[in-house]
Each structure stands twice: as structure tokens, then as C-alpha cells.
């Protein structure tokens, strides 16, 4: 009888799982951008319009540095935060602003300071804005890099015959997916935290990169802004696991002379699933997340680049 009861319970659970399993819709329809939507790519290979040097008279410029979050992976060019800030500042301040985007997917902090030094200042920036993502301190030996490689290998592995048979069960798939996601998330959290340990070589280099960028900007009288993005594949409320890392980066950037914009508070009341390109398949910020970021960044500009004085009446 016990065996029969167990079998019946499993069958009921299987049926319930199949009935209740939806398509995982979040209420947000992702905008799937193809290769043609990655345009424009300018003559220097950046995802940007052609920007002339030296800076034309009457133009104000942000030079934007970062990785795929700043480049705008998964969103249209006009939806990425640099272009949104460009439009917002031009409209709100009555000035001609350009956001020169020198970002590139996969760049880390050390590479970003090199690009600023070798190319960025040639555009005559009125402000330098660095989009900081938590993997900017990563190197090839990082635990998170190893976890990501392991995940990619696991996803590409062909299941065996027994595993394929069991995978036909919705209940088995559900349990396995939940267990796998829990274990992977624990590895992910541990991996990112290890990348900000005081003795971790990648963080030491990234910290020094912030100091160097701050010094380069200070020597030229150019304001430096560091924008800290959260990792969106996590609850963005009190359960967010990387708040201490945000604080550590903010302290380092502030000590380097930067105006810090931590975006985490801006996303606190938003379901993270509404902020990503395509759920767990692509956790880059979508156009909603870019819009929220641009609003926060544009507000911060008043602190570092004063608005033009209102014309006096005769």
C-alpha cells in the first residue's frame, strides 16, 4: 500500500507540475535585437556615431567607458544609457551634448583606464563617466570566471540515455532545475565576493585603475563619475547579495575623486525580471533598466558640471 501511495502521489505531482508549468512570462516582452540592430558601428569600431576631434565649439561631451552594460548589449543603440543621457542633457540644459561611447563588451577596469588615457581625452570631455559592473575586477583565475566556464560546458553537454529518459518528466525537470539553480547561485555569490577580497589580485588592479583614472581626470580638470550597476539576476531588495561590494567600490571610487552613482537604490522596488533582456538567458539590462540608469546619471551631472547661467534681462 505504501508503494502504491507513493506512486500515486508522484503521478499527481507530475500532473500538477505539467498543468501549472507556464512559459515563465514575466509581463515584459523582450526586444530581441539581431545583428543589424547592433548598428551604428563607427570607423573606429565603437558602437557610436562618428565623433570628430578636436571637439567642435559649442559642444559638450561625456566620454563613456565600460563593458557590455555601457555598450548596450541586447538593446537598440538609442535605448542604451549613454545615448539617453545625451538626449536628456541636451533637452534639459539647452546645450549640445554628445556621449562618446568607448565601451566594449568584456573590458575590465585595467583595460578601461588604458583606453581613457590613450583615446578618451582626445575627445575633449567635459566629464568622464565609467559604468562599473561587478565583474570589472575579474581576471582569468577568478572563481566566477571558472563557474561561468563550467556552466557553459554543462549546457553544451549531451545528456546520456538514462538522463534523457528521466528528463521527460516535468517533475524531475523542475526539481533538477531548482537544485541546479540554487547550487549555481551559491557558487556565483561566492565567486563575486572572492573577487573583492582585499588580497585578490584582480581587485588590487581594479582599485589601482580607479585611482589612476581619478588622477588622470584631476590633472586635466575633468570631473570623473563612476556609475555602479547591480547584477540583475538577483532580487534587488534587501536580499540582494552584493550590497557590500557596491559599498567597497563606492568607497574606492570616492577616494579616487569620483562622484559615485550607485544605481542599486534606483532599482530597489522593481522586479529584476522586468529589467533584463531575456530572463536567465540574457541578464544584461534591457531598455527599461537603461532608462532608469540614464535618469540617475543625468541628475548627477548637475553636481559635477554646473548648468549654464540663465541669461540676464536687459
Annotate the PLM regions.
Residues 82, 86, 113-117, 207-210, ...:
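Extracytoplasmic/secreted envelope proteins and their assembly/folding machinery
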Residues 1-15:
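Hydrophobic membrane-insertion alpha-helices, especially the h-region
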Residues 15-93, 116, 267-271, 277-280, ...:
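Membrane/wall-proximal cationic-aromatic binding patches
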Residues 133-251, 255-258, 263-274, 298, ...:
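Serine-dependent acyl-ester chemistry module
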Residues 14, 67, 112, 128, ...:
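Generic structural signal for small/hydrophobic residues in well-ordered secondary structure
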Residues 12, 17, 259, 279-314:
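Histidine-centered active-site loop/cap adjacent to the catalytic His
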Residues 61-63, 69-160:
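Conserved SGNH/GDSL esterase-like catalytic core that processes O-acyl groups on lipids
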Residues 75-80, 106-110, 200-207, 240-243, ...:
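Soluble non-cytosolic domains of exported or imported proteins
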